[in-house]
């Protein structure tokens, strides 16, 4: 029993470290324009941090675009010269990435006043209610936070390996620094949203735990406080509202980020097929290690973002299932029964969903379709460009 407890203790410490590292890193990169008042336990929007973030991020973006070093990559030069379609697709991916970066920064800063209101309300709910209602440690929360931090590290590491690892390439260090700090900033902004979603999941998990505890007590013949059920309903409704507002703030940024991952996977998959067909022209390191690791990490990042949203949605659905346990309780008083009925009706009319742009419900079903579509796009490009896949001998 001591070994699992030790593991959970380590995971809790790692999760706390990841959250703090994200917070301090966001301050340094100018992505979190808020100061924390420890006395009032409130976040305050800082105009100085807003200005610092805009100047820093736009400067880094301009610097990352200034150097003309598209020919630093020997594989890119070889493929571009012999296959114009790959160059056109790669230019399209760069445009999508640029738009994603610009919109991410501008929209995040422009919606910061609304974001600070949401975060402050979550802080109040956590301090006044959820910290007192928690019955046990939420290990899933810790695991997801750790995995998210690990994915960020792997994404940056993967990009650096691609940049510096390809043989016979001209390295421009300051260009790499600017480019990958900009990439890190976008990853961190998306991480802010996913951390908010996983916090909402944890609060829903606490509500479900309270409802299960009440159902167990009723089965044993004990009484429960109807006002506690009313409080849980109010907390549940507040979480749904905050989730909707958070999604509205981040939906464009997260959608564009997913589109960027989607397009990068297409171009990397296409280039990998070309390298495999012309295996004698390229290093085995490139074919078997560099490009495959980039694909795997990108798919993991894409799927993990989907998993965060699906976890919150499925936990909201579990609330309705837990409330059904009260249906066969014979010893409920009328007031408790009325409160449970109100909660059940509310859950039947309103469900927690992470819906981007009012169109995309982010869950496992949608994620599976996205990944299949991603693979089909690569297959389509290979079929469309079939005659140019095999390089002609010089």
Curated annotation (Swiss-Prot):
Pfam families referenced in this protein's UniProt entry, alphabetically: 7tm_7 (PF08395)
Gene field: Gr22a
Function noted in UniProt: Probable gustatory receptor which mediates acceptance or avoidance behavior, depending on its substrates.
One cellular component term from this protein's GO annotations in UniProt: membrane
Record protein name field: Putative gustatory receptor 22a
Mode of membrane association: Multi-pass membrane protein
Any one GO biological process: signal transduction
Family: Belongs to the insect chemoreceptor superfamily. Gustatory receptor (GR) family. Gr22e subfamily.
Tissues in which the UniProt entry reports expression: Expressed in neurons of the terminal external chemosensory organ of larvae.
Ranges annotated as spanning the membrane: 17-37, 48-68, 149-169, 171-191, 257-277, 282-302, 362-382
